[in-house]
């Protein structure tokens, strides 16, 4: 999320080794230690060996979890992605996941080399960060770099990890800043907490109305980078796009505790997605 989720039981993984040929990472320039390739063969995991055993554990856990994440991501978008490589290291110098994640593009060609921040002792956060970038690859060049796509990628990460990144929440800041309208307009950046937060709260609201990410994600990709959340609302509900913001605002105002998380309507993880 620099361009800024539970793990299965432990499994036997390949012994780490230095890769002969490594991907071109967005920013990492150190040694890439190969940990292995997932059983399905779609995800190859590397680690920065200088971080020692805690980072290696993160990488091994990600390797064990990778196929589950890919399968969940494919189900959300209704498509199958391509092979990706991912490296676990201290992105931004952090080892608690707060360094986020990054990749160079929003498809499986330009964005298939993914960086994720190590999170010592909390490998579910590493899986969440991986899904945040993987979901952007599944957007196929649409939405990525926009407030709409950033909100969608964060919701995907939350769904596959049971909200392992609550400290990345932006909806409370959006509420504190006066709830600017990013439903009728899309912000052409993924770095604005207000526009991302508006999107997080809006998607929470849509899901509280019964729409799942498996419906929302393909609909957003179809609308594309020039689309708005109001258009998404219209396409899903068959109501007028002009009613999206007023209806959303009414729902926000009716919240008994206000906006205190990225999921103010309490939709939580969805088994259907």
What is each PLM-predicted segment?
Residues 1-134, 138-145, 156, 243-245:
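Zn2+-dependent metallopeptidase catalytic core
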Residues 2, 13, 225-273:
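Beta/coil-rich, acidic/histidine-enriched accessory regions frequently appended to metallopeptidases
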Residues 69, 142-193:
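Post-HExxH zinc-binding segment in Zn-dependent metallohydrolases
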Residues 70-77, 133-134, 138-142, 156-164, ...:
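Sec/Tat-exported extracytoplasmic proteins
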Residues 80-83, 124, 161-169, 209-217:
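Structural helix-adjacent loops and short alpha-helical linkers that scaffold large soluble proteins
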Residues 93-100, 160-166, 226-231:
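Secretory-pathway/luminal and periplasmic proteins that interact with or process carbohydrate-rich
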Residues 94-100, 180-191, 267-270:
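Surface-exposed intrinsically disordered loops and tails
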Residues 156, 196-249:
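Extracytoplasmic, non-cytosolic globular domains
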